[in-house]
C-alpha cells in the first residue's frame, strides 16, 4: 500500500501546507523544515498543543523554522506539480510508520511522526535551543494517553475532553467563576442524585436565565472546596461543548467517533462528571441515514452507570425534544430551577458585584443593584431574574466605562467650536474688508480663550483618567493576590497564604484607599468623569429597553399623579366625571392597592361622537408615557366577521399568517407599556369579548404560538356610541346612568361588564366647552406657525365666532375643526404661499362686521 494512504487526515493536511510553503519559498523539494514550519503555523496542531502545555512561546521556534527553510536551495521555475519529497522527509515518514506500528496504530499520526524524529538534525536545530526534548516526548505521550489511531480521522480525537470540553473544576480552582449564591437546595439535590446507585444523572430544568449553568458552577466550586460527600471528592466536572464536537465533522461517522472517544475517555478516567448544557441538542445530533444520534451513543454508558452526566435545558425544549425519547428520559432525574425572588436576585447581584467592578473598572453602588433587581422585575416582563438584572448592571457599567475611556463631551464641544472658528477665520481672510478684519480680531481673542480652556480640560481629563488607570491596576493586583492566597491555602502552603493576607494585601488595600480618597477630593472640585454606576444609570438602560421615560421610574410620582385630573382637563373639555373616574383607577394602581396581575385600568367610554373619548385616550398616553405613540389603537369595525377575530392573537397553526403573530399580542409584546384603545367596540363580533375576558381578568393573553403576553402594565380603553341617543336626550345624571346601564345589558354579557373597572359616560358638549376647545386647537396651530417664524394671534371675539360656527350638539367638537380650517388655517396658508408674510411677521385674526379678517404686522 502507498505510504501516503497510511497518513491520518491531519498528517495529510500538514504535508499540503508544507507543499504550499515550499512553493512560496521557491524550493523544489518539500523538506522537514517545511513540515515543522507548517505544524508551528497551525494553532490546532498536536505540536502546538504540546508547546502550550509546556508554556513555551512558539514565535521564536517559528522564526527558527523559517531560517532553516531559507538555507534550502531555491529555484526560479518551481511549479506545484513538479514538487517532490526530500530524502530526509521520506526517511522520516518511514521512521514514523515504524513508530506507529510499535504503538499499535493503524495510521501514521502527527505525534508519532514527531516522536520518531526527535533526534533528526533539522528537528534538533529548530527545537533543541528552546525545548527540553525528553519533556516534549513525555508531553506528546500524555496527550495521546491510551488512545490508538484506528482511522484516518483518529488524531482529530486525541485528548478529546481537552478539545471538546471545558474543565469547570479547574476554572473554580483558578477562582475565575462567579460566586453562586442562594442555590443550596438545587446543588444539594444534584449531589444527592449523583451519589445514587442508579438513575444518578440529574437534569436541570428551568426558564432561560434563571441560573441553571450557575448551579453546576456552584457544584464545581464545592468540589474544589471539598464541601461535597466523600464519593464526589476529587471528581472533575467537565462541560461538553456540543458545537465544537459537531463543527468540522466532515465525513460520515466522524462525529460519532469523536463522541465515542469522549465517552471512552470519561470511562477510563473514572472520576469525571460530564455536564451537557442545552442537552436537548443530543437528541438527533449527528443522525443521518445509517448512523446513530448522540443520545443513542450515550444511552448504553448511562444505563450501565459508566457515565456520570448532568444535563440542563429549558422546560419547553425538554418537553419538545427530550421527553419523546422515553429510554433517555428515564435515565435522568429532573431538578426544577425556579426563578429567584427579587431579594434572592439582589443577593446574587451583590455576590457578583466585585467581578463586574473588576471587569469594567467602575464602582457599582448598592442602590444600583437594588434598582436593577426591582426595575427589571417590574419593567422587563419577557425575561427572567437574575439574568435580566445582571444584564442591566453589565450594560450600565459598560456605558460608564465607555464614557471614561472616551473624550468628555465638554472637551469635544470646545474642539468642535475651535475647528468652526478656524474655518470661519480662513474664509474671512480670503476677503479683506474692515468688517472682516474686525471679526478676525474677535475670533483670535475667542480662540485664545478656547485654547486655554481646552488645555485646562485636557489636563483635568488626563489627571482623572490616570487615577482610574491606577485604581484598575491595583484592583487587578488585589484580585491576583486573593487568587494566589486561595490556591496557597488549598495546597497547604499556609506560610505563603499568611504572607499574602497579612503583608501584601493590606499594603495594596492602603494604596487603593488613598486613591479613592484622592478621587473624592477631586469630586469636591467637580470632575469631568464619574466612576460609579447609580440607580439613574440603571433606569437609563431600562428606559432604552422598555421605552418608559426615566423620570417615571425614579422620581416620586405622588405630585404628578395627584395632578392627573388638571393635566387631563387641559386637553379633554367638559368631561369632569370621566376624568375623575380615570384618575381614581390610576391613583389606586400607583398607590399599589390594585391587583398587580390585572391591567392598570379598564374602562368603557360611552358617549356621542366628537365629545373627546379618543382624545382622552391619547392625552392619557401622553401623560403616563410621555409619548402619544404608546397608544395601540385597534379599530373594531375590522373585526365584525368571526374569522377576523383570530387576527388579534394570530392565525392558528397551518393557516396563512401564523408566523406573523397577532395584531394585539405582537403590539403589546413590543411595547408592554401602552394604552390599548378598542375603538367602536359595539361593531366587533361577540367572540372578541371572549378574548378580552382573559385580558381584563388575568392581565395575560396567550397568542396562537402559545406565548403568554403580559397586559399588567397596560390601560384598556373601549369606546362605544351605544346609548348615545339616551345620553343626548336625558338631562338628569342619575336617570341617564340608569338608562345607559339598561342599554349596555342588551349589548354586552354580564361577565364582560363585571370585569371593567368603570363605565365612563361622556357628556354632550355645550357652547362654553366648544369655546375652550377653540383655545386648545388654536394653541396647536400657533405652535406650528411659530416653527416657521410666524406669530399668529386670535381675538376673543373671533374665538367666540368660530365656536358659534363650529358648534353642533349632535356631532360634538368635530365640526369645530372644519370651522377653524376654513376661518383661520386656509387664510394663513394663502398668505404664506403668496409670500405676503415672511419669517418674523405677526398675523392677527379678529372679528369685523361678523366676519374674520386678518391684519399683518411686518417685522
Curated annotation (Swiss-Prot):
This protein's encoding gene: clpB
Name of this protein: Chaperone protein ClpB
Highest taxon of the lineage: Bacteria
Region Repeat 2: start-end pairs: 85-146
Pfam family, one: ClpB_D2-small
Written domain comment of the UniProt record: The Clp repeat (R) domain probably functions as a substrate-discriminating domain, recruiting aggregated proteins to the ClpB hexamer and/or stabilizing bound proteins. The NBD2 domain is responsible for oligomerization, whereas the NBD1 domain stabilizes the hexamer probably in an ATP-dependent manner. The movement of the coiled-coil domain is essential for ClpB ability to rescue proteins from an aggregated state, probably by pulling apart large aggregated proteins, which are bound between the coiled-coils motifs of adjacent ClpB subunits in the functional hexamer.
Cellular component aspect of the GO annotation: cytoplasm
Matching PROSITE patterns: CLP_R (PS51903), CLPAB_1 (PS00870), CLPAB_2 (PS00871)
Region Linker: start-end pairs: 340-547
Subunit text: Homohexamer. The oligomerization is ATP-dependent.
Protein residues bound to ATP 1: 206-213
Gene Ontology annotations of biological process type: cellular response to heat
Region (NBD1) location: 159-339
UniProt keywords, alphabetically: ATP-binding, Chaperone, Coiled coil, Cytoplasm, Nucleotide-binding, Repeat, Stress response
Molecular functions (GO terms): ATP binding; ATP hydrolysis activity
Summary of the function given for this chain in its UniProt record: Part of a stress-induced multi-chaperone system, it is involved in the recovery of the cell from heat-induced damage, in cooperation with DnaK, DnaJ and GrpE. Acts before DnaK, in the processing of protein aggregates. Protein binding stimulates the ATPase activity; ATP hydrolysis unfolds the denatured protein aggregates, which probably helps expose new hydrophobic binding sites on the surface of ClpB-bound aggregates, contributing to the solubilization and refolding of denatured protein aggregates by DnaK.
Amino-acid positions noted as binding ATP 2 in the UniProt annotation, renumbered to this chain: 607-614
Amino acid at each position: 500500500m502507498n505510504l501516503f494512504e497510511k497518513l491520518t487526515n491531519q498528517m495529510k493536511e500538514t504535508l499540503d501546507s508544507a507543499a504550499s510553503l515550499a512553493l512560496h519559498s521557491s524550493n523544489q523539494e518539500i523538506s522537514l523544515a517545511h513540515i515543522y514550519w507548517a505544524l508551528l503555523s497551525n494553532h490546532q496542531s498536536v505540536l502546538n498543543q504540546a508547546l502550550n502545555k509546556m508554556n513555551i512561546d512558539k514565535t521564536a521556534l517559528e522564526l527558527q523554522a523559517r531560517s532553516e527553510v531559507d538555507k534550502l536551495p531555491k529555484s526560479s521555475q518551481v511549479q506545484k506539480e513538479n514538487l517532490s519529497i526530500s530524502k530526509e522527509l521520506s526517511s522520516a515518514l518511514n521512521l514514523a510508520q515504524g513508530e506507529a506500528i510499535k504503538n499499535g496504530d493503524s495510521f501514521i499520526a502527527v505525534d508519532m511522526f514527531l516522536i520518531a524524529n526527535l533526534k533528526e538534525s533539522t528537528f534538533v536545530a529548530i527545537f533543541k535551543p528552546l525545548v527540553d526534548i525528553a519533556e516534549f516526548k513525555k508531553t506528546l505521550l500524555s496527550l495521546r494517553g491510551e488512545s490508538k489511531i484506528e482511522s484516518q480521522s483518529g488524531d482529530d480525537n486525541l485528548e478529546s475532553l481537552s478539545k471538546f470540553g471545558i474543565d469547570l473544576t479547574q476554572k473554580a480552582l483558578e477562582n475565575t467563576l462567579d460566586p453562586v449564591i442562594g442555590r443550596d437546595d438545587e446543588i444539594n439535590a444534584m449531589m444527592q442524585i449523583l451519589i445514587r446507585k442508579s438513575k444518578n444523572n440529574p437534569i436541570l430544568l428551568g426558564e432561560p436565565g434563571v441560573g441553571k449553568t450557575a448551579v453546576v458552577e456552584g457544584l464545581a466550586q464545592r468540589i474544589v472546596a471539598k464541601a461535597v460527600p466523600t464519593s464526589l471528592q476529587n471528581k472533575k466536572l467537565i462541560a461538553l461543548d456540543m458545537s465544537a464536537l459537531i463543527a468540522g465533522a466532515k465525513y460520515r461517522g466522524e462525529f460519532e467517533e469523536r463522541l465515542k472517544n469522549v465517552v471512552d475517555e470519561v470511562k477510563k478516567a473514572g472520576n469525571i462528571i460530564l455536564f451537557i448544557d442545552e442537552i436537548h441538542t443530543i437528541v438527533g445530533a449527528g443522525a443521518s441515514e445509517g448512523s446513530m444520534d448522540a443520545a443513542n451513543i450515550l444511552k448504553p454508558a448511562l444505563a450501565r452507570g459508566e457515565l456520570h452526566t448532568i444535563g440542563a435545558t429549558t422546560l419547553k425544549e425538554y418537553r419538545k425534544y427530550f421527553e419523546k425519547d422515553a429510554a433517555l428520559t428515564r435515565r435522568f432525574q429532573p431538578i426544577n430551577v425556579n426563578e429567584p425572588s427579587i431579594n434572592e436576585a439582589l443577593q446574587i447581584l451583590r455576590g457578583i458585584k466585585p467581578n463586574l467592578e473588576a471587569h469594567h473598572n467602575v464602582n457599582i453602588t448598592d442602590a444600583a443593584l437594588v434598582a436593577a433587581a426591582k426595575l427589571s422585575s417590574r419593567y422587563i416582563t419577557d425575561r427572567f431574574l437574575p439574568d435580566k438584572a445582571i444584564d442591566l448592571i453589565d450594560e450600565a457599567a459598560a456605558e460608564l466605562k465607555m464614557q471614561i475611556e472616551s473624550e468628555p463631551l465638554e472637551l469635544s464641544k470646545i474642539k468642535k467650536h475651535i475647528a468652526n472658528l478656524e474655518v470661519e477665520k480662513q474664509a474671512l481672510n480670503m476677503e479683506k474688508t474692515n468688517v472682516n478684519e474686525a471679526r478676525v480680531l474677535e475670533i483670535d481673542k475667542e480662540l485664545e480663550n478656547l485654547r486655554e480652556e481646552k488645555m485646562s480640560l485636557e489636563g483635568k481629563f488626563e489627571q482623572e483618567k490616570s487615577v482610574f488607570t491606577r485604581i484598575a491596576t491595583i484592583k487587578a493586583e488585589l484580585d491576583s493576590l486573593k487568587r494566589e492566597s486561595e490556591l496557597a491555602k488549598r495546597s497547604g502552603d499556609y506560610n505563603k497564604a499568611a504572607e499574602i493576607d497579612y503583608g501584601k494585601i493590606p499594603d495594596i488595600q492602603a494604596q487603593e484607599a488613598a486613591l479613592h480618597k484622592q478621587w473624592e477630593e477631586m469630586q469636591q472640585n467637580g470632575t469631568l468623569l464619574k466612576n460609579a454606576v447609580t440607580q439613574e444609570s440603571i433606569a437609563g438602560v431600562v428606559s432604552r429597553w422598555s421605552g418608559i421615560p426615566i423620570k417615571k421610574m425614579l422620581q416620586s410620582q405622588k405630585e404628578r399623579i395627584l395632578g392627573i385630573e388638571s393635566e387631563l382637563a387641559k386637553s379633554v373639555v367638559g368631561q369632569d366625571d370621566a376624568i375623575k373616574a380615570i384618575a381614581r383607577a390610576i391613583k389606586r394602581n400607583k398607590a399599589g392597592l390594585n391587583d398587580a396581575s390585572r391591567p392598570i385600568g379598564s374602562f368603557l367610554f360611552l358617549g356621542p361622537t366628537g365629545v373627546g373619548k379618543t382624545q382622552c385616550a391619547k392625552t392619557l398616553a401622553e401623560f403616563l408615557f410621555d409619548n402619544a405613540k404608546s397608544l395601540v389603537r385597534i379599530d373594531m369595525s375590522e373585526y365584525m366577521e368571526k374569522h377576523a377575530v383570530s387576527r388579534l392573537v394570530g392565525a392558528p397553526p397551518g393557516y396563512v399568517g401564523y408566523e406573523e403573530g397577532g395584531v394585539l399580542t405582537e403590539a403589546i409584546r413590543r411595547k408592554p407599556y401602552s394604552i390599548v384603545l378598542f375603538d367602536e367596540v359595539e361593531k366587533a363580533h361577540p367572540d372578541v369579548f371572549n378574548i378580552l375576558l382573559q385580558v381584563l381578568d388575568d392581565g395575560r393573553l396567550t397568542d396562537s404560538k402559545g406565548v403568554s403576553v403580559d397586559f399588567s402594565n397596560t390601560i384598556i380603553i373601549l369606546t362605544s356610541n351605544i346609548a348615545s341617543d339616551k345620553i343626548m336626550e336625558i338631562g338628569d345624571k342619575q336617570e341617564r346612568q340608569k338608562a345607559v346601564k339598561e342599554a349596555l345589558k342588551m349589548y354586552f354579557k354580564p361577565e364582560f361588564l363585571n370585569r371593567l373597572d368603570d363605565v365612563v359616560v361622556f357628556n354632550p358638549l355645550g357652547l362654553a366647552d366648544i369655546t375652550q376647545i377653540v383655545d386648545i386647537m388654536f394653541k396647536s396651530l400657533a405652535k406650528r406657525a411659530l416653527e416657521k417664524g410666524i406669530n399668529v394671534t386670535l381675538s376673543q371675539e373671533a374665538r367666540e365666532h368660530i365656536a358659534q360656527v363650529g358648534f353642533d350638539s349632535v356631532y360634538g367638537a368635530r365640526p369645530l375643526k372644519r370651522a377653524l380650517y376654513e376661518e383661520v388655517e386656509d387664510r394663513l396658508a394663502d398668505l404664506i404661499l403668496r409670500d405676503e408674510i415672511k419669517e418674523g411677521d405677526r398675523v392677527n385674526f379678529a372679528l369685523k362686521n361678523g366676519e374674520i379678517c386678518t391684519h399683518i404686522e411686518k417685522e
